[in-house]
Amino acid sequence: LIFFSTLKAYSQMTPREVYQKNVNSVVLIITKNKDGSKSKGTGSVIDSSKVITNAHVVLEGRDQMPDEILIFLSEDNFNDESQKNYKKGRSAKILRYDSDLDLALLEVKRIKTVPAIGLADSDQVMVGDPVLAIGHPESGGLWSLTSGRIGSIIKNQSGIKGKHVFQTETSLNRGNSGGPLLDGNGDMVGVNTNISRRSSDGLAITGINFAVQSNVLRDWLRMGGISLANTAPQKSDQTDVGIKKKEKVNPEPKKQTQEMESLPDNKLLTPPRPFDDKDLFNLFEDE
């Protein structure tokens, strides 16, 4: 069962408490491609053996799959470059995905004891609310924590019906794709998905990042037959809109991934441990 938070706490947790509550439920995703290249993203354990991430983390374009998907836990690799710590990759397969919503559900072996992240009712989130993100930004530390606030609430982003997102200033970068956007109670209010880096005339844009709302994720999971417990009420105008017809199930494996564009990471709360992606990929081996 996937648990949703239904009540707000009287006093919110500190960023440190939110991080400690959820860091073991956030995974590193490494995709291996037939041409030998690799790429990375972030995911969240939301149920026994199930991880949610972005479709673009495990797809090239809209429907081409990588040759292999490996999942790593913080307990395996936490900011340690020693070769031995990078031999614990858990094989994952895609159960379903939706390229328009930019969501993908993975099934992963041997993570049944990993705690699941709770999903909040995103209808209760308001502009100005503080939020946090955990992920693996390029050139930053693995399992990094960044902070910000909700800047705007957007429905039907890019004209895609049912794709309701939060705009946030929370610092994100390549590698944060698919990771959780967390509220002050440590529950997921969104799945970090993309950022704006430059306008059409080339002007630099900073602090404009987006996360698919947790209620969109909840409805999409329900359409796939994933049972939910302690589900918070949801507004009728955000229920099951434009999701079912776009869903893909059990696609054939193909090749590589896409990731977010980068932004300056000026709100890194964890001690920086820079990783060059090429060096990082060379360390990873599956069991």
Per-range role (PLM):
Residues 81-93, 127-132, 143-155:
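Beta-strand/loop subdomains of soluble extracytoplasmic proteins
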Residues 17-18, 61-62, 93-95, 108-141:
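Active-site substrate-binding loop(s) of clan PA
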Residues 54-56, 136, 194:
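Short, surface-exposed secondary-structure boundary micro-motifs
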Residues 21-36, 108-116, 143-222:
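Active-site region of chymotrypsin-like
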Residues 1-5:
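Bacterial N-terminal signal peptides
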Residues 40, 47-48, 52-100, 111-113:
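Catalytic-histidine neighborhood of serine endopeptidases
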Residues 12-19, 66-69, 73-80, 87, ...:
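C-terminal cap/linker of serine protease catalytic domains
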